[in-house]
Amino acid sequence: MANEDCPKAADSPFSSDKHAQLILAQINKMRNGQHFCDVQLQVGQESFKAHRLVLAASSPYFAALFTGGMKESSKDVVPILGIEAGIFQILLDFIYTGIVNIGVNNVQELIIAADMLQLTEVVHLCCEFLKGQIDPLNCIGIFQFSEQIACHDLLEFSENYIHVHFLEVHSGEEFLALTKDQLIKILRSEELSIEDEYQVFLAAMQWILKDLGKRRKHVVEVLDPIRFPLLPPQRLLKYIEGVSDFNLRVALQTLLKEYCEVCKSPKENKFCSFLQTSKVRPRKKARKYLYAVGGYTRLQGGRWSDSRALSCVERFDTFSQYWTTVSSLHQARSGLGVTVLGGMVYAIGGEKDSMIFDCTECYDPVTKQWTTVASMNHPRCGLGVCVCYGAIYALGGWVGAEIGNTIERFDPDENKWEVVGNMAVSRYYFGCCEMQGLIYVIGGISNEGIELRSFEVYDPLSKRWSPLPPMGTRRAYLGVAALNDCIYSVGGWNETQDALHTVEKYSFEEEKWVEVASMKVPRAGMCVVAVNGLLYVSGGRSSSHDFLAPGTLDSVEVYNPHSDTWTEIGNMITSRCEGGVAVL
């Protein structure tokens, strides 16, 4: 017996997990024995006895039917229309047992009937079943079915599956049965996993040619999502010449001619066309190549004078995750600027053995060769480069005895550099990137030899500079890239902390810098690019120890902004610092 002097414990609730199951099992037993059944459901030629309370508690449809003042609420026999008796039997069994038998032969009828009866749990289970059955041969059918019944969860899943497996999907018969609007929706997606844009063009043409008589009128509309600036002109021309239908061939030739006229349009019009960045940039999930160009290399523990300028170029495949070598630069150089324009990689300026260069080289991935193009007006190393409005901009840098503060612009059509303005703050070995038609410069080293925190934006059209909030940390030899409407400042160096592993992100929405996850390795003079929604950081140099020169790095890290984590991937073939990286 409890001690009467002890305080009584408060009552505590206890629950039984089996209670609901036992009650449901007993109710089902009563249904099978036709005990207490108060309604008969007539489905086609078959009738099912059940309990109004159980039906109303399981389904808003039945709750409205029996309690909403409808005539069925007082009838002993209630007809259920639009459902086959065998399917209704399965759903009624689920109401009384919580178990549903789903198979490939009944899943579509089940999900339609369950949706009508507002049995959301059965709809969910059917969707999960279809997700488990999806493959490249049936995903289009599942996509169309989910669109037809407005099942948004299954629609999103099947659509994502089509994007990921596009190369397998578009070769199947179901792909050719897409409606025009469904096809266009798929072809517009940034998420198509493709090797190149030409595969999307072929898929569109394949759909048109399947029923040319009826689909001829949709040619322009269906081909509109194709990013023609990314298609090799000769390959496209060869395809068009091979089209047997005369009218279709003429239509394609007209489209190609219009595209070529846009590419050769006057500078003012070209500025407008290049604002349509979705047409000139590869899709987010397209196969891309990272080109690591030039830089210098030095062994760990070597002397400062042991650094060697590089001419070698490596290419990283985002699909295979391997590095391979490609044609080398004509001129070995470090501290250069690297960018991409018109499907070509440009290597600009730089230095070797204290000789600063003004020369520019251009790499054609089709011919796999570097060629020399026009030189800048001023030699520069530690400069910033980016592409804006169809031209290359080269900013600042070290020009010999001082820091250059001029801005040059390269027009590929005229093969000419011209000075177009000046920097607000002279700097070299700074970060530079373009975003939505504006050029951003961050950090670097000033005229006084001090590492900077400052952040500025340049408008190439108005030629005006505007200050933005400074970074939290002074950084020179940093890497910068734009990703998801933010700008990232990665690593770098300052005299107090040496090589940095910290990373800051500028949010335009919040108008401030915030720190994100740090890299695994401190790096200065590394390269940073945004690819497929991720940041790739390659090479650079580590911190110096015991007055020894820091060694160059061959490691590569990838930052995922969604998980705020860094992952190491395959190393470069050659360690390098103060090189450049371009994405094609």
Curated annotation (Swiss-Prot):
Subcellular location: Cytoplasm, Cytoskeleton
Entries under InterPro entries matching the protein: BACK, BTB-kelch_protein, BTB/POZ_dom, BTB_POZ_IPP, Gal_Oxase/kelch_b-propeller, IPP_BACK, Kelch-typ_b-propeller, Kelch_1
Ranges for domain BTB: 37-104
One GO location term (cellular component): cytoplasm
Membrane-spanning segments: none
SMART domains (alphabetical): BACK (SM00875), BTB (SM00225), Kelch (SM00612)
Biological process (GO), any one: proteasome-mediated ubiquitin-dependent protein catabolic process
Alphabetized GO MF terms: actin binding; ubiquitin-like ligase-substrate adaptor activity
Repeat (Kelch) residue spans along the chain: 289-343, 344-390, 391-437, 439-485, 487-533, 535-583
Sorted UniProt keywords: Actin-binding, Cytoplasm, Cytoskeleton, Kelch repeat, Repeat
Function field: May play a role in organizing the actin cytoskeleton.
Name the UniProt record assigns to this protein: Actin-binding protein IPP
Species assigned in the record: Homo sapiens (Human)
Gene: IPP
